[in-house]
C-alpha cells in the first residue's frame, strides 16, 4: 500500500528530476541579465523556430538548402517538349492557370491536377500553350471562396505601369544569356563587402538598372579594392519605398531594375573582375 506521503515524495522527485534536466536560464539570458523578464517569451519563440525548422525539413529528412531549392521543382519550367507548372496548395479544391494565352479565362486545358496523396498540383502544357513574355496567374478555389494568386515559386514577376498590379511572366528568351566566366571562386582573405542597392545607386533621379550599375558603379567598386558586393532589395517586392523588405516573390529578381539576362550580365562582369555577389 502506497501512502499519501510516499506519493508526494515520488511526485517531488519527478519534478526535481525534470527541473534538473532543464537549463536554469537560456543562453541569451545568461549572457544578458536584462533579458530575464522576457525569458519565457524568448524561449517560446525559440521553440517555435525549432518546430518550424522541423516542419520545413520534414524532421531532418531534408535540409534547409533542399527546401530553399524548391524552385527547381515548383513553378513554371520549360521542358524539352512543352512546359510543366507545379504549385503547393494543400487546401485548394481547384487550380486554373489563367493568362494572356487563354484570355484570362478558366479552361479545362489549363486546369491543374492534384498529385494524389500530396498538397502538390501539376499542369503539363504543350509547346505552343504559352510563349515568352506572356503574363499569368493562378485562380485558386478553396472551401468557402476563391481568388487570383501569383504562384509562390514564380521566377519572373512584373508590374503593370497603369494599374500597379503584379503578374507572373513567362520567361524563355530566344537567346538565353551565355556566361563568359564559367568558374569563379571568391577571394575571402579577407572578404571586403560593398553593400549596394541597384535602384538607388545612380546619380539620376530615377530607379537605376542592372546595366547602369554594371557600367557606372561596378568599376568604382573594383577600383576601391572590394572583392564582394551584397545587393539589397533584389527579390521582388510590391512597394519600392520598403527598400526591399516587403518581399512578395522570393525567387524572382526584381523586374524594376531590368531583365534576368541583364542581372546575369552584371554578375558575370563582377565575377570576371574577381568580385563575389551576394
Identify what each model region corresponds to.
Residues 2-84, 105-195, 200-205, 212:
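The feature marks proteins involved in alpha-glucan
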Residues 87, 138, 196, 221, ...:
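Conserved, mostly hydrophobic/aromatic
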Residues 88-95:
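Short proline/glycine-enriched turn/loop motifs at strand-loop junctions of beta-rich domains
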Residues 97-99:
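Conserved aromatic beta-strand anchor motif in extracellular beta-sandwich/beta-rich domains
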Residues 122-124, 199-202, 235-237, 266, ...:
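Domain-wide signal for the mature, well-folded portions of proteins, strongly enriched
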Residues 192-196, 229, 277-278:
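Hydrophobic faces of well-ordered beta-strands that scaffold small-molecule active sites
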Residues 204, 208, 219-265:
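Aromatic-lined carbohydrate-binding/catalytic grooves of carbohydrate-active enzymes
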